Each structure stands twice: as C-alpha cells, then as structure tokens.
C-alpha cells in the first residue's frame, strides 16, 4: 500500500564515547529519564507526527534493542500495514554485507522502502533527545518545493566546529555545507534529520554506492554531492529542546535538565506523550525516614535515604542513611546503607558498597560507575586499609 512518507531510523551506532554504557547495547537503547530508552523519543515523535511506517536500521549489539522494540506496541506502531520493522544487515547470495555508513544502511534497504512507494523518506537518528513534529517539517519541505530538507538548530558559535554546519541564504536555501569546519561561517548545525523526495534519494544512493571512494555517509558524501549537483536543499529551523547525548557528561546533563521546573522537554505534556515499554514494576516505596526533593523516582524503587535532584530508574534501592545528589541511578542499581553518591551515573544493576563515597575529583566532572569501576575502587580501598 502506498504511503506518502515513511521513516528510516538509524539505530546501529555504537556510541563509543559513552564508554561502558554501550559495551553490550547499542546507543539508542541506553536508559534515559527514569523510565525511557533514548530511542523512545524518536519513535514517539513518529507516532505523534502521524508517521505510521518506520524502518529501524540496527547493527551494533542489537539484541536488547530488537527485544525492546518488538512489534512496536508501546508506540502504537503494531500495524498490519506499515508499523515498525527492524532492519538488521542480512545475507544475500554474495554473503553478509554490513552497513558501511548511514547512506549505505538506507541503500541496502531500498526494497523495504519500495514496497510502500513513498513520495518522501524521512531519515532520522535514534540517539538524540528531543520532541519534534515531523509533519510540520514535511509541510515546510513541500511548501519550499525542496529536493531535500535538513533540520537545523542554532548552536553557540564556540561549539559550531563540532557539528555539520549549514550556510544558507535569506530563503533558508542551503548554499554551503561543511562537516566540522575549523572556521564556521554559520552556527546552524545539522540535527541529522532529513526529508528527501524518494525518487531523488534512490537515484543518489545508487550513485553513492557505486563510488568506491565514498564513505557512504549522508553528511560527508550524499549531501555535498547534492549541493554540487545544484539540487534544492533547504534548512528547517528547529527551536525546541535538542540534545546529542553522545558523551557521559552530556547524558548526565540531559537527565538533569529534566529536573528543571520549566524544562523544554516536559515529560508530563499530555499533548505529546513519550511512550515506552512498561517495566511492570510494583509501586515505589519511600520510607518515613527518607528525604526526597527535586527528583524523578520511578516504579519499583525503594528509598530509605536522602535523594536530592536525581533520577532513579525502576527497581532502584537507596539504603538507610545513604545520600544521593545530582545523580542518575539506572535500573536495578542500589546505593547501600550509609553510602554517598554525587554527580554520578550508576550503571544498571551496580551496587554501591555500604559507607563508601562516589564523587568526581573535578567538581565539573561526572563519575560513570560500572562493575569494573567498583572493582578498582574496592581494590584501592583494600590497599589503603592494609597500609
């Protein structure tokens, strides 16, 4: 059945800058915000925007992500016609060919796209935190009679060299694109969200695939090629909350942003819900002795200590006399009796030992607490005790 617009969601990235958080799971599956995973935001945006056909392209450590997405029920994407389809690399007569770049991942799934014969293809990244109505962007794309529309956001000039930067004319038509320029001419950064006219995208994916010198990436190869060919590329200005949670510090910051009273993301907005898989946990329990302030405390938590400006995921336990400040405690983790935790991300199922202390040496830094970190910390404590 023909679709006006379908989405291709790139979710195969490793996210190596998140260190141990992505050792066994893909970056889009990393927990966020007390009950979500990062990919929930993009999938929820699709549902809320009326995009009912989504191909999710996976590659790195896909097991948990595949299980989590399932048939898409949590996001109302369990449709007979369309819905969500997980698209890992697959074997053909010449063998298994891994995805070699963002553009190549979409190219290898041309047959999936063709079965819906769409007019437009929305290409998304599954590893950013934001709310966006893609229908507004599509209307803009059509009104501009564009071949390609790229969503952009203004970033501080001092940070512009970290992004793909668009230089536009007064009509917002893109006249120049530079990937991480040393001397940026603009502060309009690409958000990694593209709308293509499908016939044109198909043509240029085939051209790019035939080029042995290409890295097969949208930002590095396909977009510059379209600019050289004088195609109509427009920038779509986005003004809401958007966060690239590619580092431990930025992931912590995004979680802390949720605790601001007037935060732009607003998880409690009934008009734009962020959907997730229900963890099926019992209600939270906060003991009479506990003190909790400015925090998100999810289902299944047991809090007997002090929690200030922190995010607790499902199944977290905070022991008696324990203190947790400005921290993210991920699913199943525990802070034992009398322990102190500040400015930390505690990974799933980790246990902070009784009466221990976790805080960064640099006041502006963030500690990532993993099983390996705890092992090293315990060994150092034992050596000090022996001395």
From Swiss-Prot:
Under which EC number(s) is this enzyme classified? 2.7.7.27
Tell me the GO molecular function terms.
ATP binding; glucose-1-phosphate adenylyltransferase activity
The alphabetical list of record keywords is: ATP-binding, Carbohydrate metabolism, Glycogen biosynthesis, Glycogen metabolism, Nucleotide-binding, Nucleotidyltransferase, Transferase
Q: Which reaction does it catalyse?
A: alpha-D-glucose 1-phosphate + ATP + H(+) = ADP-alpha-D-glucose + diphosphate
Q: Which Gene3D superfamilies match?
A: Hexapeptide repeat proteins, Spore Coat Polysaccharide Biosynthesis Protein SpsA, Chain A
Q: Which residues bind alpha-D-glucose 1-phosphate?
A: 99, 164, 179-180, 190
Q: Known SUPFAM superfamilies for this protein?
A: Nucleotide-diphospho-sugar transferases, Trimeric LpxA-like enzymes
**Its domain of life?**
Bacteria
The pathway entry for this protein reads as: Glycan biosynthesis; glycogen biosynthesis
**Biological process (GO), any one:** glycogen biosynthetic process
Say what the protein does.
Answer: Involved in the biosynthesis of ADP-glucose, a building block required for the elongation reactions to produce glycogen. Catalyzes the reaction between ATP and alpha-D-glucose 1-phosphate (G1P) to produce pyrophosphate and ADP-Glc.
Please report which protein family the annotation says this sequence is part of: Belongs to the bacterial/plant glucose-1-phosphate adenylyltransferase family.
Self-association state and partner proteins as the record states = Homotetramer.
| NCBIfam families in alphabetical order | glgC (TIGR02091), PRK05293.1 (NF003670)
- This chain's protein is named Glucose-1-phosphate adenylyltransferase
Q: Which organism is it from?
A: Geobacillus thermodenitrificans (strain NG80-2)
Query: According to the entry, what is the taxonomic lineage of the organism?
Result: Bacteria, Bacillati, Bacillota, Bacilli, Bacillales
Q: Gene name?
A: glgC
């Amino acid at each position: 059945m023909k679709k006006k617009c379908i989405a291709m969601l790139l979710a195969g990235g490793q996210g190596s800058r998140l260190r141990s958080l992505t050792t066994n799971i893909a970056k889009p599956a990393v927990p966020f915000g007390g009950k979500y995973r990062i990919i929930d935001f993009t999938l929820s945006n699709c549902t809320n925007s009326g995009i009912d056909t989504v191909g999710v392209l996976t590659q790195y450590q896909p097991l948990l992500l595949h299980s989590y997405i399932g048939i898409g029920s949590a996001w109302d994407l369990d449709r007979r016609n369309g819905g969500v389809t997980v698209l890992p690399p697959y074997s053909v007569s010449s063998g298994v060919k891994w995805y070699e770049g963002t553009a190549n991942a979409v190219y290898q799934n041309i047959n999936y796209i063709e079965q819906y014969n769409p007019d437009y293809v929305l290409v998304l990244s599954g590893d950013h935190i934001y709310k966006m109505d893609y229908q507004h962007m599509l209307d803009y794309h059509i009104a501009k009679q564009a071949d390609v529309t790229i969503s952009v956001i203004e970033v501080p000039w001092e940070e512009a060299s970290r992004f793909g930067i668009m230089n536009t004319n007064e009509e917002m038509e893109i006249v120049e694109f530079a990937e991480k320029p040393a001397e940026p001419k603009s502060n309009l950064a690409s958000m990694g969200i593209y709308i293509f006219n499908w016939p044109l995208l198909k043509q240029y994916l085939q051209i790019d695939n035939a080029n042995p010198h290409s890295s097969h990436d949208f930002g590095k190869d396909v977009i510059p090629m379209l600019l050289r060919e004088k195609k109509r590329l427009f920038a779509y200005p986005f003004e809401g909350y958007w966060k690239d949670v590619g580092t431990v510090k930025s992931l912590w910051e995004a979680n802390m942003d949720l605790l601001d009273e007037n935060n732009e993301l607003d998880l409690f907005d009934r008009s734009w819900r962020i959907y997730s898989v229900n963890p099926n946990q019992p209600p939270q329990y906060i003991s009479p002795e506990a003190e909790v302030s400015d925090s998100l405390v999810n289902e299944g938590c047991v809090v007997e200590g002090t929690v200030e400006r922190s995010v607790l995921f499902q199944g977290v336990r905070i022991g008696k006399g324990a203190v947790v400040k400005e921290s993210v405690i991920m699913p199943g983790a525990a802070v034992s009796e009398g322990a102190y935790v500040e400015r930390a991300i505690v990974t799933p199922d980790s246990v902070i030992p009784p009466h221990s202390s976790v805080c960064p040496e640099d006041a502006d830094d963030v500690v990532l607490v993993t099983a390996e970190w705890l092992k090293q910390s315990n060994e150092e404590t034992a050596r000090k005790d022996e001395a």
